[in-house]
């Protein structure tokens, strides 16, 4: 059994990824999580009636290489289903799809983009100009320094329709912030890595199980190395002696020791765990007080019949941004195109609908709606939010007008992500600290990514790398981005050499 032990405080993706990496490297890891479930902000809850729901539907993209590596390490890769088509619907009920063609990047999306019904020709022309600027700049176009994404779009002469029906739709969902409060750097990065530089970057991966089930392999992997995962185990404060971490005081008053510690908790929680002098003016954690957060609201509906055949929909011109067909996504039935394709006999109807039986023998369907940057909903009652979403469902899914709602619930994550406002990077600390054996993990640390699951895993790997270096075992854990392909590869080289 390894003689060196590492405490990991926090069982979200940042803590789990660092813990798994260290366990794989032979260290004895003790992971402490305050809540009963692992996953942090990407987890599941059990309702009083026994239904298990995600706090908010989380998705990955093909460009999230470190998250994919983490899922592989914990045996969860097969629980993620990837989709090659993105489905959109506007207030008039018009459907549009975006998918890659055989053309090389950045042209691979062009054929389906040209057929996107919700955009006018002028909208498409302006979007093409901005996309070309991103591609020719190798993901780093001019006029972005200190600018918001909205500023940059205006500088690129984007039409109102392009901003509201394309840029805003994609970016508010991806970054959980409004365009006027988003650093242009991060907005552009979403399109460069997800839609332009590689033909696989845009593919949407959705868990086929409740989020908490994705992390079941973590306990076993850590235990195999002599470690332990302790849920319902909160930490009151970290003990520091001189310039070294000495241990942690738990909420029950007991103390636990370790040869090193990775603090993988939300940035505001960290301030309450660490010595006060670490957050004083000029100290390493001073900037954490300046990091703002953004809310996400999820709304869950159970209908008495099938009302939706697509696996998911992105809504235009609505408060609701995404609808996820959880009945279909959890069914094990594969989809090909916009209709359901059963994998076996008698699993679907001729029209492509998936039929899920209730106890009474009737059809039932569970939909989850997601609203990012939901500032306007934070103070509204759950009844008001449910009514709003029910009206919007009727716009895009006519079958819901006659369907009965068996039950509905609302989950608000008021501090779901950190806000990627211009200049936020100056407040984000590194994974190392002045305390020799204390390291930080969290999407709010310096990862080069915004507040995403990919960013959380990157932080975990970087913290584990720092810990391994501390123990004299330097190891590279961070996975490379998808390769830049097609014309983008040529433009990226020219941009890097300063010849663009």
Q: What would you call each of these model-derived segments?
A:
Residues 2, 234-339, 343-346, 350-353, ...:
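Mid-domain catalytic core of redox enzymes
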Residues 190-252, 259:
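Helical element adjacent to the flavin cofactor pocket in flavoenzyme catalytic cores
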Residues 4-31:
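N-terminal Rossmann-like FAD-binding beta1-loop-alpha1 element of flavoenzymes
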Residues 324-334, 413-440, 444-447:
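FAD-binding beta-loop-beta segment adjacent to the flavin cofactor pocket
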Residues 67-68, 72, 77-188, 199-201:
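Mobile amphipathic helical/loop "lid" adjacent to a hydrophobic cofactor/ligand pocket
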